[in-house]
Curated annotation (Swiss-Prot):
GO terms for molecular function: rRNA binding; structural constituent of ribosome. The keyword Ribonucleoprotein applies. This is Large ribosomal subunit protein uL24. InterPro entries: KOW, Rib_uL2_dom2, Ribosomal_uL24, Ribosomal_uL24_KOW, Translation_prot_SH3-like_sf. Pfam families: KOW, ribosomal_L24. The gene is rplX. The lineage of its organism: Bacteria, Pseudomonadati, Thermodesulfobacteriota, Desulfuromonadia, Desulfuromonadales. Part of the 50S ribosomal subunit. GO terms for cellular component: ribonucleoprotein complex; ribosome. GO terms for biological process: translation.
Length: 108
């Protein structure tokens, strides 16, 4: 199976462009290639009924659910809006990810 190519990376700030958390930003915590999804910190919260285990009490807990990658875009702090990604090849052969509008680097 081929690796999924995506426009967002783990640790990057993204903005949700569709769904119940539209226009909210957060950091990508995990990438799920089989589901083409990501888990964003503090967004798409769902309630789970958890059974007590050992010394951990049971109850209703909130956790992040996955969001499809088509519903998020990288967030540029300089533009203060979601942007498309442009790749620039440097002299040494490395690729740098840039904001397509302002040219600001999207690297961590």
């Amino acid at each position: 199976m081929q690796a999924t190519k995506t426009h967002v990376r783990k640790g990057e700030t993204v903005m949700v462009i569709a769904g119940k958390d539209k226009n909210k930003t957060g950091t990508v915590m995990q990438f799920l290639p089989k589901k083409d999804g990501i888990i964003v910190e503090g967004l798409n919260m769902v309630k789970r009924h958890v059974k007590a285990r050992g010394n951990e009490p049971g109850g209703i807990k909130e956790k992040e659910a996955s969001i499809h990658i088509s519903n998020v875009m990288p967030y540029c702090a300089k533009c203060a809006k979601p942007v498309r990604v442009r790749l620039k090849v440097l002299e040494n052969g490395d690729k740098q990810r840039l904001c397509a509008k302002c040219g600001n680097s999207l690297e961590k």
